[in-house]
Amino acid sequence: LLVGCGDKEATVAAPTDSAGSEPAAVAEASRPMAEVSQARLDNAAEQPEQWLTYGGSYDETRHSSLTKVNRDTLSELGIGWVYDMKKPRGVEATPIVVDGVMYVTGSWSVVYALDARTGEEIWVYDPEVSGEDAAKGCCDVVNRGLAVYEGKVFVGVFDGRLEALDAKTGAVVWSNVTVDQSKPYTITGAPRVIKDKVIIGNGGAELGVRGYVTAYNTDTGDLVWRFYTVPNPNKEPDGAISDEIFAKLANETWGDTGAWTTDGGGGTVWDAIVYDHVNDQVLLGVGNGSPWNAAIRD
């Protein structure tokens, strides 16, 4: 992990020996961490010195209004510090930064909390994804990010778990298996937090699954609702909030036979989840059908 700053020589951040040990900048036992309220998320764009949520704000524009880095100062940038994640696989996550602490995921769904100023390690959490589960993925054991809210860090684990971690120590607060682990489901996308709910999707449509997103209570981990993106293969209710819309509009547009009825139909929401806070709606980007080959899907 490389972090840039103005015209300075790089420092190499030394990992600590155990989860939970804190460098001086964050050593105060009473110091709150990841104190991100709903109000802060609603107004994330007004705090450009922070990066509170995936995409920077609910709009997910990924735009920063900070002005110190511009055409005139670009040549002055250098490497501020370097941190070795010790996992030689792909890294696709954008870090979350809250009040001087950086939270970021690496490959194998490992979560790191670092001092954003120095790169010193605060804690590391490894969910210990197995090689057997890794074989289910289409595109490496990457992870695209996490969410923070009211003292917790939320991560979607490659093997289908959604976990809440204590932002101060990295300890697991709660853990839920969100998928049928006998099927080739994976999670590589970042969770989104909206009004005391953490929302997570999944991947795996390339190999034959049925897509859905699920909302869990951020405090307890209890399931709040689930929305499927393709109909039930038997056109039956799932006991999910998607039942009504399928009965009214979708079931009749899907055939009663075809490989989709046995291979799930696909439509996984493997990353794109956006909250429209003006209309209080969640918008989903839906992935490919399953089987991928449309000639045998229908």
Please provide the spans of the model-predicted regions.
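Bacterial signal peptide processing site
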Residues: C5-K8
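Blade/loop signatures of beta-propeller domains
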Residues: G20-I79, N234-A247, D298
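Repeat-blade elements of multi-bladed beta-propeller folds
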Residues: W51-G55, G90-V110, K136-L162, T186-E206, ...
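Beta-propeller domains
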Residues: L66-I79, G106-E128, D298
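Short coil/turn linkers that define WD40 beta-propeller blade boundaries
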Residues: L74-L77, G119, G170, G221, ...
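A structural motif specific to WD40 beta-propellers
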Residues: G80, E120-V124, A171-S175, V224-W225
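Extracytoplasmic beta-rich repeat domains
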Residues: Y83-T94, V124-A147, S175-A190, L207, ...
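Short loop/turn segments that connect beta-strands within beta-propeller blades
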Residues: D115-T118, E128, D166-T169, N217-T220
